[in-house]
């Protein structure tokens, strides 16, 4: 599905082509830029689920050695083009975040900007264990995912992972949670519009009644908020986790 999004193709039969990419905001995430300014990034960096590469390009421009991985070949193609346009060196690659074979003991810092909540329970456990293998002793993992909160009435457009679930997954996989709390994530609302009829039947059948109701609520709120925005950018409620690798 994600590869089709990056190629601008319909993700399901009967669906229109995407009007945009919700996480394409044309820059690094503001909270990541703050983290870097505060000294939270060190050593060899892994940007996992790098998407269009804006975070990786930003960190490389700040002098870090960055490896950026994504499961979508189309995302990596576009990320490489972006890095070349800016003139920075990033090591890009296509990889399964739940495996990471070949990357053992490589990284001191991991940045996850909206990948974690895309995985199911088994996938998140495999992912956390894989990152443990791919990192060095005392590595830090900075994780940003959808939360159950709201920002000025704006809620998550999809179901979030509970804080208890995140705590259990990370601590059972060799990670110590140093901080877990609320934050925000900048999103492109131009890609989040439409009405319920724009959700193809194939996708609707895969969603629970609760998820469909939540999406309808989000769309209703966006109808009110988006006309007030100058640039289609909106902050969504997220959870941030800063975790340390333990052995």
Protein language model annotation of sequence segments:
Residues 102-110:
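A short acidic, Gly/Pro-enriched loop at the edge of an enzyme's catalytic core
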Residues 1-40, 44-46, 52-86, 90-102, ...:
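Class I (Rossmann-like) S-adenosyl-L-methionine-dependent methyltransferase catalytic domain
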Residues 114-118:
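Short catalytic micro-motifs in class I SAM-dependent methyltransferases
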